[in-house]
From Swiss-Prot:
UniProt similarity note: Belongs to the glycosyl hydrolase 32 family.
Keywords: Cytoplasm, Glycosidase, Hydrolase, Nucleus
UniProt record, GO biological process: sucrose catabolic process
Name by which UniProt lists this protein: Putative invertase
Major subcellular location class: cytoplasm
Gene3D superfamilies: Exo-inulinase, domain 1, Glycosyl hydrolase domain, family 43
GO function term, MF aspect, one: sucrose alpha-glucosidase activity
Annotated positions binding substrate: 15-18, 34, 75-76, 149-150, 202, 288
Hydrolase among keywords: yes
EC numbers for this chain: 3.2.1.26
Entry-linked SUPFAM superfamilies: Arabinanase/levansucrase/invertase (SSF75005), Concanavalin A-like lectins/glucanases (SSF49899)
Native organism: Schizosaccharomyces pombe (strain 972 / ATCC 24843) (Fission yeast)
Annotated InterPro entries: ConA-like_dom_sf (IPR013320), Glyco_hydro_32 (IPR001362), Glyco_hydro_32_AS (IPR018053), Glyco_hydro_32_C (IPR013189), Glyco_hydro_32_N (IPR013148), Glyco_hydro_beta-prop_sf (IPR023296)
Active-site residues annotated for this sequence: 18
Length: 508
């Protein structure tokens, strides 16, 4: 039986980690990824490449970047569409024999890693993103540092320039650079030693997001931490909200916020040039604390989250304070619904079977309402939603459980016993956090959306203001195919349903 996820991207074989070079070009979403095609652990880093028209069904393309004669490894980076040919690569002349469609002028900006040095480099495509030519005058940026990597580049319209954010990983600095041609870069400013430091900063991203219900925007700086996460001691992603004047990022407060409170979300990156100004992200769904050791029953290791649309919104942080947070919602899941299928309502206090198994992933959604008076009378009661491989949910060792306490918003996810044949001391089976009810009026309300796929579950609470992404590795190949939903006495389901999703596996 297959254990490859149905709607989560995985490599055809080998080891995959960070998403790289996410960009939209001429109706296609380009996804590049850190890839070791010859081994099942990190190393021998290449850039793999796939394209999609809907962000779920991916077609593999030839390897985009591979180590060259200097043996430098191809580390993480980004991609842009150079519509105005600022680089000079795309008009008939010195670099190109013919003019390239402005919407297909893809430039990759990436780190080359050597044993004692990391530099920033570029490559460009003259065939719409099928093959890439490394710039002969690389590197474009070399500051003689050994931990200088992961450039994210975007066009900043207000200053009419390209902006690069890149980390000095073990000095806890995010550096901002400016360029008019993608080849020559001038330093603007620094941001750093903020939030959770851990061992190092990695994989920055920098995006302008709308604030829901207003005509305002804020800039969000995303920084990954590894190891030393405040969640699990390993990998995590944090973000800072602020303003950007074309030179300097200024946070609105001193808070560091967590992007995903699960154990398996890292190296979050957003698509450049997305239509309609949407901001869509994908993350690596694993953790450096154990990724090189997780069980392999197929030819690959590594998977990505499903795409998420990002916005900012004001929400309750507790009963007295509202604050600005990131909201993440799954993108276009309704496009994956089976034709003419209707969602099956969720049933309470009984073991129920999924509508389909093996062939697809399943999305669960529910909104639970409970009177405030009942919460105050019984503050320690939990809502529990459990998924299991067997109908004997209470004794199963291969299960996944989500729990929520309305009184204080405490939430936990438990991913069961991984495998009697695989144990790893840095693989935690439970994660905990908190998210307030969406209302503190007469009724407390909890909204849940959970995407259940083979080997991974993504949970979105309160419309995506909290996310918990967790992979799971059971001993057998049986899927999660039963669920049990228990709610506190007096609670009611305002809405509920589960919907099977079309299988989008690109390879077996």
């Amino acid at each position: 039986m297959p254990v490859r996820p149905c709607i989560h991207f995985t490599p055809p074989e080998g080891f995959m980690n960070d998403p790289n070079g996410l960009v939209y070009s001429n109706g296609k979403w380009h996804l590049f990824f850190q890839w070791n095609p010859t081994g099942n652990q990190a190393g021998n880093q290449h850039w793999g490449h796939a394209v999609s028209k809907n962000l779920y069904k991916w077609k593999l393309l030839p390897t985009a970047l591979a180590p060259g004669d200097d043996h430098g490894l191809m580390f993480s980076g980004s991609a842009v569409i150079d519509k105005t040919n600022s680089s000079g690569f795309f008009e008939s002349g010195f670099f190109s024999r013919k003019s390239v469609d402005p919407e297909e002028r893809i430039v990759l900006i990436y780190t080359t890693h050597y044993d004692n040095r990391e530099t920033q480099n570029i490559a460009y495509s003259l065939d719409g993103g099928i093959t890439f030519i490394k710039y002969k005058k690389n590197p474009i940026l070399d500051i003689k540092e050994s931990q200088f990597r992961d450039p994210k580049v975007f066009w900043h319209e207000e200053s009419r320039a390209w902006i690069m954010v890149v980390v000095l990983a073990q000095k806890y600095k995010v550096l901002f650079y400016h360029s008019l041609n993608l080849r020559d870069w001038v330093k603007l400013s620094e941001f750093g030693s903020a939030g959770v430091l851990g061992y190092q900063y990695e994989c920055p991203d920098f995006v302008r997001l709308p604030i829901e219900g207003t005509d305002e925007f804020r800039w969000v700086l995303i920084v990954s931490i590894n190891p030393g996460s405040s969640i699990n001691g390993g990998s995590m992603v944090q973000y800072f909200i602020g303003d950007f004047d074309g030179q300097t990022f200024t946070p609105i407060d001193s808070a560091s916020r967590i992007l995903d409170c699960g154990h398996d979300c890292y190296a979050t990156q957003t698509f450049g040039n997305a239509p309609d100004g949407r901001v869509i992200s994908i993350s690596w769904a694993s953790n450096w604390n154990y990724t090189n050791d997780v069980p392999m029953r197929m030819k690959h290791r590594g998977m990505f989250t499903i795409p998420r649309e990002l916005t900012l919104c004001y929400t309750h942080l507790n009963q007295e304070t509202r604050g600005l947070v990131l909201r993440q919602r799954p993108v276009n899941l309704h496009h994956l619904y089976y034709p003419d299928s209707l969602p099956a309502p969720l049933l309470l206090n009984r073991v129920c079977e999924f509508p389909t198994v093996w062939t697809s992933a399943t999305v669960f959604y529910l909104a639970v309402s409970i009177p405030k008076s009942i919460v105050l009378e019984s503050p320690m009661e939990f809502l529990c939603l459990t998924w299991s491989t067997t109908p004997d949910v209470e004794t199963s060792k291969e299960y996944f459980e989500l729990g929520y306490r309305f009184h204080d918003g405490a939430v936990y996810v438990e991913r069961g016993v991984c495998s009697s044949s695989w144990k790893y001391p840095l693989y935690p089976e439970r994660c905990t956090s908190s998210v307030p009810p969406s209302s503190y009026e007469d009724n407390y309300i909890l909204e849940i959306e959970a995407v259940v796929d083979h080997s991974i579950i993504e949970v979105y609470l309160q419309g995506g203001i909290m996310c918990l992404t967790n992979a799971y590795y059971f001993k057998g190949d049986e899927p999660l195919q039963y669920y049990y939903l228990r709610v506190p006495t007096g609670a009611s389901l305002a809405k509920s349903g589960m919907q099977p999703l079309l299988n989008n596996r690109p390879h077996s």
